[in-house]
């Protein structure tokens, strides 16, 4: 499954608990937009899957994935820890052997209630292993891990970090204010629709193009505020050009691929010669 659902993952730091609360809420609220904007998994086994992001559709149907409603709230470290403790264990590792989690929760492990391992208690490594098997759209480790983007070409791979860096690092408060009226039920509905509808996904009565175009402006201001100058003498805003092109043309990479595939019915024509 991992080989067939390749994604671009992004790790971003936080400075304080309050900083984490803000960044995590924003990152999770942007998941439907991220799915729509970075969609690039439409062809499956040489056929049009009828989804723009088949990868996202697959992960939404797993028992350990998804976008928990609590992630759209102001979740702090304690609430996230409670979420982790209440999450079923996928597997245990003891003496270099892997054992089934058997529907135990990590809280059972913490309380020494797992008979199969003689009621032993978990180590930090055991907690790290458990955290690595929570496949939500975003998750907390020593950093915030963003996981909702499809893998794509070089321009797109650079654009993702630039977009989220501009918002979460450069212009966090303005971005949060912009999304402050979004309702959880609308976000969750958009999350379900985005893999198939892409930029046409409805959120609060407007399509993704409206929301993303405004967020791109906020991200651009954030990157300009950071003013990180590269060897070329330009700042990070240049990496947003690919996303602006998608919005201006109203065509994601997935849509472009579907159009070419529909015309030629040949995967080879999707690659530059």
What do the PLM-derived regions correspond to, one by one?
Residues 1-139:
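Loop-rich catalytic cores of soluble enzymes, especially ATP-dependent carboxylate-amine ligases
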Residues 50-57, 186-189, 237-251:
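Amphipathic alpha-helical surface "interface" segments used
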Residues 72-93, 209-236:
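An exposure/low-complexity boundary signal
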Residues 105, 207, 252-253:
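Short, structural beta-strand-to-alpha-helix junction motif
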Residues 137-139, 143-232:
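Substrate-recognition/cap regions that form aromatic- and gly/pro-loop-enriched pockets
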